[in-house]
Amino acid sequence: MKPEAHGGDRLRMAALAGRAPDSLLDFSVNVRPEGAPEFLRLALCRALDHISAYPSPHAEEAMEAAARVYGLPADCFVFGNGTNELIHLLARVLKEDGTPCAAVIEPAFSEYALACGLAGLEVRHPDCGVRRDGDSDEDMLRQLLSLLADIPARAAVWLANPGNPSGSFLPPASCRRLLEARPDLLWIIDEAFAAYAGPDDISSLITQLPDNAVLLRSLTKFHAVPGVRLGYMVTRAERARRWRRQLPAWSVNAFALAAAQAVLADTSDFADRTRDENRRRREHLCACLRDVPGITVFPSLANYVLFRCEQAPADLYARLLREYGIAVRDCSNYRGMKDGSWFRAAVRLEEDHQRLADALRGILHPAASVPPRPRSRRPALMLQGTSSDAGKSILAAAFCRILRQDGYDVAPFKAQNMSLNSGVTALGEEMGRAQIVQAQAARIDPEALMNPVLLKPHSETGSQVIVLGKPVGHMQAREYFRYKAGLWQTVRDAYDTLADRHEVMVLEGAGSPGEVNLKQHDIVNMRMAAHAQASVLLVGDIDRGGVYASLLGTWMTLEQQERSLLAGWLVNKFRGDASFLEPAHAYVRQATGIPVLGVTPWLRNINIPDEDMAGFPWSQAADTTPPPPGILDIAVVMPRHVSNFTDMTPLAAEPDVRLRAVRRAEDWGQPHVVILPGTKSVAADLAALRADGLAELICRHAARDGWLLGICGGLQMLGRAILDPLGLESAAPSVPGLGLMDLESTFAADKTLVSVRRAATPLPVMTGGYEIHHGHTSHGPSALPLFVREGQGAPEERICGYVSGRRWATYLHGLFDDDAFRRAWLDHVRQDVGLKPQGRQLVRCDLEASLDRLADVVRQNVDMKAIYKRLGL
């Protein structure tokens, strides 16, 4: 028997498969697929601070921690460099103590017999066989006692519980009966996988340790850190003290010692969650395997399953590796399983189980087999960020356009968007404005599947929730977190539907995947990346400072499985010579193994709407000084819950306009034009404008017959009254407006969602846009129609704006996106206030041209070859 005959030998398996080790789907090693829990990874990270000192000689801190947990003397515990070291220690001391023989209950972990053989002990192999469905604990007890009838007194018995490779389990009460029936034997019970069978009180003998027992326990199997090498044994104190002296000092290193203390001190729900998760996944794995004709699956309570293919070809193990890149545990080195038909598979993710079942079906039943499922999903690139406004949205649009330019049918996707900037599709669906722009970059029609969940905040803790383009209600944060659990399937279905129709997907995350307080409820960042099997680019905003600390800090919060999705870092919004950043890039790569794939510059003169409030170009402190000669001064009053502020972005690009954000009365200045934009909370924001003194300034401006434009919520504020009979936005059924226009608005449950291709205006040009608002507005005789939509229906039904002299109000978002209308309106206002009209377009807010320029800049500054290679394109 060879010592290396175990699962998890990645280099050997990769050589046989002819593949890179990281490309293998490994069922041969029984490790939680997500990797180590967060608390344990953090403990290992902290241990770095102690590697300059020797650890305690015999892991005394871990002994004390175990004693506190189990209520046993610390001297009862012996810690070692993995249970494998302790197995060999036991074999040696058993030989020294004159143990007549060692009985290894087969089939069993090969290391027991190997260690005893190396120590010179006689080894016997009573074969218990494999437990089947229907076999009772009583049957197993009788069989074991019968098999051990001729084992002499003072012999040692090695028994794994749960069994390896079978996963069969004998409850502690039955184990005690077994030990009591043969008190003349030393029972070595290996509980390496017992944590999967239940908490210690129902899975382990440690809570009532028998005198003739030695327990072997692993701290790395359940917690997915086999590379740390950490295990311990428990027995009576006198025995443990004597055996501990046989171990060399410092066999438990600083990392293993830190891991031991972290695991033993853990009071979180990690263990319960892991058991529940493993049970569900194990049942799924069993079902997948049973679905393959000719495979027999045996019962297990561990995180692995034993199965048999009696008609398996002799090279089944090798073919799984070579043809499918799948490694299982070949059990032919176990006693009683030498015919090549026995295999063990670790519990992994459901999609992994299906891949294994499909591969087995393809080998065992090639003629009847359905074609294997695709080995991977559509190629998917995902932009995540170290923060909000890191540039994810604009870069996602850039990659959509680059992929489209290179001939790929690409679609954007963002699972959940929190934004007050939304738009309407041709089907009347509401979705995030950023995803609409990304769809335009991909040259496809936007649809709500691209942004299945949209949150539009209306207070500090509440939002309107829009699912698949339709509002489902207003929710507070806690209420939404409960509701959100049911949205994950909606999000996955939306993504899968889109991905089935396109060649490549470009996903966008939200905020940062490093927000540890939000991870549990994540549906938009790493959880979405895992579902899409996306290659993730993490974007950091260098203009804010601290970008490399942010990249490394985010990486530190990611779990092992999440880190495997990271393809590279992108440093965004850089001003200067990127070559000066090379030392930082080398450091980040050395620390993480992940390369910086691009440094994108601060983008100028590319007029593409941003998603986040922090991103618009006129968010800096208001300038109240008189504008330069010939410049039209436009003040945008900013309600606290401003929405669709991108309506004004095209104005900011005009060289003859100074666009100012006004949030306080002292920011007012002497504007030529005041714009009151949309808001998600009209009544509350109107009250705030009154409290801040801004409402009075708006009224004074109107009294001087100054130009005034209200958009959506701004339209409603300008009217006589805002009625809310259903209490949609406030408890008050009626709120007085500013009284500047003869309008009365009434909120209604149904939302108006209209895409307006063309609308007539009082100017010699038309415009277009979209409407998003609750309820309707009625007008008196002094408020005349301003904009009228083209199309069917009575003219009164198609009104989307009103005018009273220099006071304009409209429900039309995006009206300034039209270059001709924007210039006509600006020149109309300029002439009226005594400024010379330009008479020609100064700026083209041509989104197509802007997207092409954006793609060119990103392509020049990002390693597209590396990204395409990662995507398999």
Describe the role of every protein-language-model region:
Residues 278-279, 289-324, 347:
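Conserved PLP-binding catalytic core of the aspartate aminotransferase-like
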Residues 373-699, 707, 749, 759-771, ...:
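Flexible phosphate-sensing "switch/lid" loops adjacent to ATP/NTP-binding sites
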